[in-house]
């Protein structure tokens, strides 16, 4: 069996992390190495890990640098045949890792494989996510049909969140994630870069993880109106992704027609939810940076972004 490192990303979710690690350790295939990347938790996560999971290697970040930053920490240093990037809000099925590994190494051109995400929060029988992509015309989310035939084995995807098993050779060829994207769409950007090298990403529908986050979210949360940094990312990242991977005509259609509609919708919701002025300032900064990226291809560094919106 190929070797595997599991890298769990966490921030102030000690109890979720404990359940996640327990499910990994009690599976049919024990990972060769388990790492936890702690994004500056203040809830006693570090102490819990030292006490209850001494076999886990812990990396403590002094600030919350986002998912992509932690993913890059793991991608740049693992030495096994594969790497599972796992969020702390998963309770994996006992055979999930074993099934993913077998599938990943059954096909030379399969670079990434993911499990089916079930709604572990309140209805474990319900599928909450099984793949998708961003439309390069409109920027909207295109999600795979959750009512798939029982005999179907896989779904292709460009969205690779939450529990992503990556083959080492594909990771080495693709390089690191763009941490300037912070979280939203950074996974799709990475997957599309990998696809250009000839590697596919697929959901293995027989492998399962229970996603323990609440699926029903408020509109404010769904729109990123939770903090200025997330608002900035929502304003910017669609345009960045379409600029990088769409044709010129697709990008022009998006920027001249769809993007203004998105902006009007988000600005309306800022008024509706009475978002503070800092949110409006962040959103306008995202618009400016998306336009700047269209002409120059440049984006502010992760440290610059954090200084502006923290």
Segments (PLM) and residue ranges:
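Short beta-strand/loop segment that forms part of the nucleotide-sugar
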Residues: 32-40, 59-60
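Glycine-rich, basic loop-to-helix element that forms the pyrophosphate-binding segment
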Residues: 61-78
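Short aromatic/hydrophobic "clamp" motif used to bind/position activated sugar donors
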Residues: 83
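Acidic/His-rich active-site region of diverse nucleotide-sugar glycosyltransferases
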Residues: 91-176, 180
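Non-catalytic, C-terminal membrane-associated alpha-helical segments of glycosyltransferases
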Residues: 247-310
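Short, acidic, metal-binding catalytic loop of nucleotide-sugar glycosyltransferases
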Residues: 22-31
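A conserved acidic beta->alpha catalytic loop
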Residues: 23, 38-47, 63
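A short, conserved alpha-helix in the catalytic core of glycosyltransferases
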Residues: 158, 163-166, 170-175, 180-208
């Amino acid at each position: 069996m190929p070797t595997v490192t599991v890298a769990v990303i966490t921030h102030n979710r000690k109890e979720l992390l404990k359940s996640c690690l327990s499910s990994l350790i009690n599976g049919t295939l024990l990972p060769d190495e388990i790492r936890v990347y702690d994004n500056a938790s203040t809830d006693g996560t570090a102490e819990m890990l030292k006490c209850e999971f001494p076999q886990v290697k812990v990396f403590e970040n002094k600030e919350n640098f986002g998912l992509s930053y932690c993913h890059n920490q793991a991608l740049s240093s693992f030495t096994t045949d594969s790497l599972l990037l796992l969020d702390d809000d998963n309770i994996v099925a006992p055979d999930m890792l074993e099934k993913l590994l077998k599938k990943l190494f059954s096909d030379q051109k399969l670079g990434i494989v993911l499990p089916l995400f079930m709604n572990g929060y309140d209805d474990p029988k319900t599928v909450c996510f099984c793949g998708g992509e961003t439309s390069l015309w409109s920027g909207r989310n295109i999600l795979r049909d959750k009512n798939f035939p029982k005999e179907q084995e896989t779904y292709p995807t460009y969205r690779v969140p939450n529990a992503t098993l990556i083959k080492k050779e594909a990771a080495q060829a693709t390089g690191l994630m763009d941490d300037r994207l912070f979280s939203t769409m950074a996974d799709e950007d990475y997957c599309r870069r990998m696809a250009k090298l000839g590697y596919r990403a697929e959901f293995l529908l027989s492998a399962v993880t229970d996603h323990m986050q609440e699926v029903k979210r408020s509109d404010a949360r769904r729109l990123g109106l939770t903090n200025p940094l997330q608002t900035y990312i929502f304003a910017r990242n669609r345009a960045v992704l379409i600029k990088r991977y769409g044709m010129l005509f697709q990008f022009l259609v998006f920027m001249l027609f769809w993007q203004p509609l998105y902006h009007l919708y988000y600005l309306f919701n800022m008024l509706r939810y009475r978002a503070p002025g800092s949110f409006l300032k962040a959103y306008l900064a995202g618009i400016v940076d998306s336009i700047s990226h269209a002409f120059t291809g440049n984006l502010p560094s992760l440290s610059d972004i954090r200084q502006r919106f923290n």
